Amino acid sequence: MIERKNHEGYADPTAYAALTRVIRQNRFAYICSPYRDNPRVNVMRARHYWKFTVSKGRIPIAPHLYFPQFMSEEMERERVMQMNFELLKLCGELWVFGDKITKGMEAEIAHAVRLRKKIRYFTTKFEEVL
């Protein structure tokens, strides 16, 4: 949350307006796509989603490409989801890819709704679903 006052307690509308504008221009897009049902194939797809996201001028955040490298999805599922939610807080939008929504994706979408993030849906062929 952005404070409207400076560290001395005085109103600081210029800093507040500048920080608010920067946050609104957030270029991070959280990539929400299947992982667990077929990790090898889904990681390949997520890499394509990354490229697409970059081509649209966004910076992709795809936790399912990071955390499985050093954590066990099955053993540490709850911890992984909490870290995913923290990364989602940093993003301006949630981009959902694929033709089916998994339970993990449902949780990420629900969290994005709670955070009032913009959510965009895409097919596996990168067509936006409106």
Language-model segments: residues:
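Catalytic phosphate/metal-binding cores of nucleic-acid and nucleotide-processing enzymes, i.e., regions
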Residues: 1-130
